Structure formats: structure tokens, C-alpha cells
Amino acid sequence: FEDYYEREAETWELQALTRARVIWASSPAFQARAEGAIAVALRRPRDPKRTAVDVLEMRQLMEDERPGKGDWDLKLTPGGLVDIEFAAQFLQLVHAAQGGPLAQNTGEALAALGRAGLGDPAALAALEGAWRLEQDLSQLLKVALEDGHDPDTEPKAFRALLARAGGVREFRS
């Protein structure tokens, strides 16, 4: 693991590693070693411009290979959860070597990056707010609708609930 992440890991693998957590370990010592190895891999210095290019290329590849299924695919649609996650992962990767915060949860990462002054405060606040909104709406849609169902076809009361969850007066897709 340590050798691979030092010599061979691509940026997308490091992006995924920002979300890694040890679920089970055979001993507390092994857990500490695993957590330490993750932190070392993430805290290596990296070129911000190269990292930005890599992240943008991976996002484009995802969009080409697995596009969103419409406006209500809150994860994959442009501006959706994946874009917010990629922004948080990018900022963590480029600032970690200088002691920037690392957090597995995207909302916590954005908040920590904001507190550390590692990005435009208004942009980070907007990303965090959008992430929370999309989390709330995603949960509501998962509970209320079958996969692939279009909220536009739902009864007026359900659309009003979506509008309220989204903090707007009325529902319009």
C-alpha cells in the first residue's frame, strides 16, 4: 500500500483515498499504521496545476462514460454531488502537504477548508450549502420515489415538499 501510493497512484486514486477510513483492524497498532499510511499518502506535496488537470480530466471521463440521467440525477448531473466532492478532494490534496485539513466527509472537508482559509470563503460556503441541499434532496427522493421516476410527474403536494426542502417558493425543474 505504502509503496504503491508513493510511486504509482494516480490522482483519481488519491481522490478516493481522501474518503478512506479504517473500518476494522486486527489490532489498534495496525489501525494506527493504516491510518498513518493514508495520511502520509495524502500529505505528499503535489503540483496544484497538474492535480487540477488530472481532476478535470477524470470528471470529464466520468461524464463521458457515465453521464447523469437527467436533471434529477443529483449525483452525476453537472454541478451535482460529484462536482462538489471533486472540488473538496482537489483542495484537500493540494493543501494537505502544508498541513491543510483532511476529512472523509465532503461537508466536513469544505467547512474545515473554509476555517483554514484555503479557498475563497464565499465559494466554499456556497459549495457546502449546495452539498447539504443535495444531500437532503437526495434522501427525500430516495425515500419517496422509485429509481428513475421523474419528480415533475408527482402530485402538487409532493412538489411543494421538494420546493420547501430546496428553500424555494415553488417547484420547477
Q: Where does each model-flagged region fall?
A:
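A nucleotide- and high-energy phosphate-metabolite-utilizing enzyme signature
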Residues: 1-173
